[in-house]
Amino acid sequence: MVKVSITKDLYKLAAAHKYASMLAEYLSNGTKYWCFGSHGGFERNYQAMAANIRKIHLKLPGERPWPPEFTSSQRTCDNFLVYAQHYYDDEHFQILAIISPDAHQLSDVMLPRIITLAETSFIELSPDELASLKTYDA
């Protein structure tokens, strides 16, 4: 069962909780949501790839959704939902950042901090520490 938690920095952001619930469904069974677009990693950054950090293009509330005929790879924008997959529990993910606007430009600058956040507060947590996190399951 896929579980998605939220980093402490975003915990008070209501939208992050909604995205966590939707991300769990998306990763678990491929449920499509109006706000989720193209999905991938930060392939040009070895440290981000090594830390299991990924991104999904994200439409924000109030933005017009992509046309329904667009494929996932056509659903691109300049906002990212950034998350990591745990090293040992491959069904547990954590939302680390929402980068908006100018995600393509800012992500290179923000990645070192996001990598450190993933490494120090999520990707190597023990099973007991993971169990203590509030999660959205699917």
Where are the predicted features?
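Basic, Lys/Arg-enriched alpha-helical interface segments
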Residues: 1-78, 87-138
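Hydrophobic/aromatic beta-strand elements that line small-molecule binding cavities or substrate pockets
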Residues: 81-82
